[in-house]
Amino acid sequence: MLEGIVRESTGKKATKALRRDGYLIANIYGKDFPNIHAAFKKGDFIRTVRHKEKLAFPVKVGDKELEVVVQEYQKDPVTYDLLHVDLMVAQPGVVTYYMVPIKTVGTPIGLKNKGVLVTSKRRIKVKGAIENIPDSITLDVSNLDVGDAILIRDIELPEGVEHMTAPHVAVVGVVKAK
């Protein structure tokens, strides 16, 4: 379980001091839930997020244990270091928006015809309760030829979950290599 600290001071000086000590600044929030200003060790946070198996993962901040979902993050424009992360509390039964990762399996037949697999969306926005949201969406790209694409409307979601992205948007496709 990822453990963090509660930040007492939320000012610029305190934030810079925490970042200098290797902490990642985080805000934890939810519907009818008080905001928590927290900080996590950057290495521990990245390791936890990379190796998590579910969309929601447990964190312990102060004396509270919460299931949270990464809602948004901010990176430094030059060094690409993680600066800030917004974590939303995954409350059962509460319908809200989530970003679900896309995974592809298979080798497209279009690669043999001088095509290149292009992933347009790595995550798609969906709406539903956390218990209905899939941990990831797996797309089989083995039937894609040059010029073919998988659109949002082609992706099947579980009952109680709906797309929040326009149905004509391409997620993955095979284009002709130049």
From Swiss-Prot:
Signal peptide: none annotated. Keywords: Ribonucleoprotein, Ribosomal protein, RNA-binding, rRNA-binding. The keyword Ribosomal protein applies. GO terms for cellular component: cytosolic large ribosomal subunit. It comes from the Bacteria. It holds the Pfam family Ribosomal_L25p. CDD domains: Ribosomal_L25_TL5_CTC. One of its GO terms (molecular function) is 5S rRNA binding. One of its GO terms (biological process) is translation. The keyword Ribonucleoprotein applies. PANTHER family: RIBOSOMAL PROTEIN L25/GLN-TRNA SYNTHETASE, ANTI-CODON-BINDING DOMAIN-CONTAINING PROTEIN, RIBOSOMAL PROTEIN L25_GLN-TRNA SYNTHETASE, ANTI-CODON-BINDING DOMAIN-CONTAINING PROTEIN. Belongs to the bacterial ribosomal protein bL25 family. CTC subfamily. This is one of the proteins that binds to the 5S RNA in the ribosome where it forms part of the central protuberance. Part of the 50S ribosomal subunit; part of the 5S rRNA/L5/L18/L25 subcomplex. Contacts the 5S rRNA. Binds to the 5S rRNA independently of L5 and L18. This is Large ribosomal subunit protein bL25. It comes from Nitratiruptor sp. (strain SB155-2).
